[in-house]
């Protein structure tokens, strides 16, 4: 089994790290990870997606940061490398966002992008 461990293909804001750790701690599920991935859709062609996942797939990359709790599939990684994940709270609500230098266009909500 291939074990891909990457040193910081993405950066994470302090607020994102804090929120990820808090949610994982509250769920109290052994080996729970934060999965970051790209899916087709949205108004710009691709969408950023996040979910908490116990399963690591064979070709997933583990981001070697704060106890290896971030996983990314290889296709999503090529679109996300060099980006930053942040967690924001404002009057509209709270959410994880990605600041992606590879995105040529983003929609107004910040959830979808094109390359």
Swiss-Prot record:
Its keywords, alphabetically, are: Iron, Iron-sulfur, Metal-binding
State the Gene3D superfamilies in the record.
HesB-like domain
Give the GO molecular function terms: 2 iron, 2 sulfur cluster binding; 4 iron, 4 sulfur cluster binding; iron ion binding
Positions with a binding annotation for iron-sulfur cluster: 43, 107, 109
**Entry-linked InterPro entries:** FeS_biogenesis, FeS_cluster_insertion, FeS_cluster_insertion_CS, FeS_cluster_insertion_RrpA, HesB-like_dom_sf
Q: What does this protein do?
A: Required for insertion of 4Fe-4S clusters for at least IspG.
Complex formation: Homodimer.
Name-wise, this protein is Iron-sulfur cluster insertion protein ErpA
């Amino acid at each position: 089994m291939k074990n891909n461990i990457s040193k910081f293909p993405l950066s994470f804001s302090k607020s994102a790290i804090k929120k990820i750790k808090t949610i994982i701690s509250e769920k109290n599920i052994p080996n729970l990870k934060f999965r970051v991935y790209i899916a087709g859709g949205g108004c710009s062609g691709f969408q950023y997606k996040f979910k908490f996942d116990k399963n690591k797939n064979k070709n997933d990359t583990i981001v070697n940061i704060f106890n290896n709790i971030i996983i990314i599939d290889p296709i999503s990684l090529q679109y996300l490398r060099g980006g930053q994940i942040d967690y924001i709270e404002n009057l509209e609500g709270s959410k994880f966002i990605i600041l992606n230098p590879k995105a040529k266009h983003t929609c107004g909500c910040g959830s979808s992008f094109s390359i």
